[in-house]
Amino acid sequence: ALAWLTLGLIGVSAGAALALNVYYTDSAFARDDYRGMVRTINALATPQDAILLDAPGQRDVFSYYYRGNLPVLALPAQRPPLAAETTANLAADLAGKRRVYALFWATDESDPSRIVETWLDQHAYKVQDAWQGNVRFVIYSLPQATAPMQPLAVTFAPLADLAGLALSVPALPSGEVLEITLRWQVKAATAQRYKVFLQLLDGADQVWAQRDAEPAGESRPTSTWQPGEVIEDRHGLLIAPGTPPGRYRLIAGLYDAATGVRLRTSDADFVDLGLIEVTRPDAPWPRAAFTMQTVVDRQLGDVILLGYNHYPRGFSHAPETPLRRGDILHLDLFWQAVATPMQGQQMTVSLDGPASSQVVSEAGPLASAGYPSSQWQPGEIVRGQLDLTLPADLPAGVYRVVMHVPGTIPIAGADIGMVNIE
């Protein structure tokens, strides 16, 4: 059986301590954001989860930051890796686990045949795969049961038919992962690499959850597909903490990774996979589970505006992308209920120019029309979204984003940042 690492500063040697000092002072090491990865693990993990490190050199650095109680698995355990032993230990030690937080570093040396990742791609659902400096931080969801495959017949010409769909559950609380299996029947070979996209949309087509990735945990790019093949394609779609309870449409499709152009079905550039019910979690998510560019902490009537993010719509992955005239400025707003019951409060967000002249404004509920603030529970954190369409003739310059909550007496408001329009 695999040995689980016992982490803690007690076991750090003098040599390791010196190495850690270099890690904190050398910018080349600082780019590997172990502190941030540990913060994510601490915010999202439950006692049913596990952590995976694939390189011995990670142990001391990771243990400096991580003080939790989750089992930390060191795999592969041998050099060179032994495939049969490694996969057997993965199956045994991850049995009954809910999620795996994997930190992959120097995989060309530690696992050149991708034994660990191949097993996870085949048995788990990849939720996130992001570089943190030289470390890949990957989150997997582990299925608790086998979901039945529903037959489909949707052609994404000329590449493939979507022949089947399996969903782990029809309803789940925010903060959980929807496990999705797509079955592709390949019709034609291609040299192009297409990504699969999955989106959870509300009635106004606002995106509340999204996953973009190459098929099969990115292990089977479409450039390797051959006519007649059947590709089992697993994806984990995280329903972010704070997503308002309600019913959402799940859609899927394929787009060219180089150009962004989508493949079409007979009548659209996506397929509707049905409705998913998002419910309120049994316990509120802690504040640490929410990523905010800017913290505000201002009470506006019966709610607190904790903070916000803003970026051009569609660029949450690159929020520094410049805004231009005619673009859509997207806002993520993080609210916390102070008390209950409350009235169904509304907000107005405006873009103000010189001398506080209002350029454009939008009004709407704090989070969603289907989950008014009157239904929030004390202490609950809810994520809202709102879009501001910038006029095509808007002069370039710096503008202020201002929010007001009209239902308060006097009317409460808050500045929510400056934006530069190019």
Predicted ranges, named:
Residues 187-188, 236-245, 338, 387-396:
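Short, surface-exposed loop/turn segments at beta-strand-coil junctions that are enriched for proline
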Residues 172, 186-193, 323, 337-344, ...:
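A short beta-turn/strand-edge loop motif at beta-sheet boundaries
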Residues 144-173, 279-324:
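Low-complexity, acidic Ser/Thr/Pro/Gly-rich terminal tails and inter-domain linkers that flank the onset
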Residues 194, 230, 244-252, 347, ...:
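A short tyrosine-centered beta-strand micro-motif
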